[in-house]
Structures are given as C-alpha cells and as structure tokens.
A protein has these predicted regions:
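Domain-level signal for soluble alpha/beta catalytic cores
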Residues: 1-128
C-alpha cells in the first residue's frame, strides 16, 4: 500500500525499477499490487511474474465513487498481456483504513466497493 490516510497517499511510482528482482526471485505464492491510479505505472512489469498469483488492486479504497465495471474489466484484460487470466485476481488497492482515522468513506460505501469487486470477479472468472 502506498498510504491510505484520510483518502490521501504518500508514495507514487511504477513497479518497473524492482520488478525483475521482486517478481522473478521472491519465493512467494502471490503479490497484492496497487493499480487503482496512474501512480502505479503500467502492467508491463508483470512480464517478470512466473507462476505466482497476482492480485490486481484496481478498486480504490480512498474514494466512494464506484469504478466503471467495463473499465475495470478492460484493465484486467490489459494485464493478461503479461499474466494469464487464471493467475489474476481482483481486490481493492488497499484496506479501507491504514490508520484509525480511516478514509473519507462511509461503511456502506466500503461495502459497495466490496460488492463491486465480487460482481466483476463473477463476470470475469465465473466458476473458475
């Protein structure tokens, strides 16, 4: 997470500078990656992914407005240029609060984001 204090962030930059070492040489089963804004760069660094699961954090947890389903699905499709669909998952880019102050969202708005993730995942992956 690149920060999640009252709907703000503290870091930006793509994964390219660390992608080869991080994705090719870390002995882990998966990566949870923030991709909810341009601050995270492109999906191209995912070319270094081997057999790990990649959880794409495409749904922002900073603001209550719901993302467009078709736009999110298009981003998932874009990521499949680098990682097979069966290795991809979808999630919010971070938890809904990294600090006790939280973000500028109500609990109902947070649950709407969770439902959106579920709906898109059902449409993209179905019963896989």
């Amino acid at each position: 997470c690149r920060g999640n204090f009252r709907s703000t962030w503290f870091s930006s930059g793509g994964y390219e500078p660390v992608a080869d070492i991080l994705f090719s040489h870390c002995n882990v089963d998966g990566f949870f990656l923030e991709y909810d804004s341009d601050r995270s760069g492109s999906f191209e660094p995912l070319r270094f992914i081997k057999n790990q699961t990649v959880v794409l954090g495409l749904i922002t947890s900073k603001f209550p407005e719901l993302e467009d389903k078709d736009a999110v699905k298009a981003r998932i499709e874009e990521a499949t240029k680098y990682v097979p669909l069966n290795q991809l998952c979808l999630s919010p880019q971070c938890g809904f609060s990294s600090t006790e102050e939280g973000n500028i969202m109500t609990e109902d708005e947070q649950w709407a984001k969770v439902r959106l993730v579920r709906e898109i995942a059902d449409e993209v992956w179905g019963d896989q």
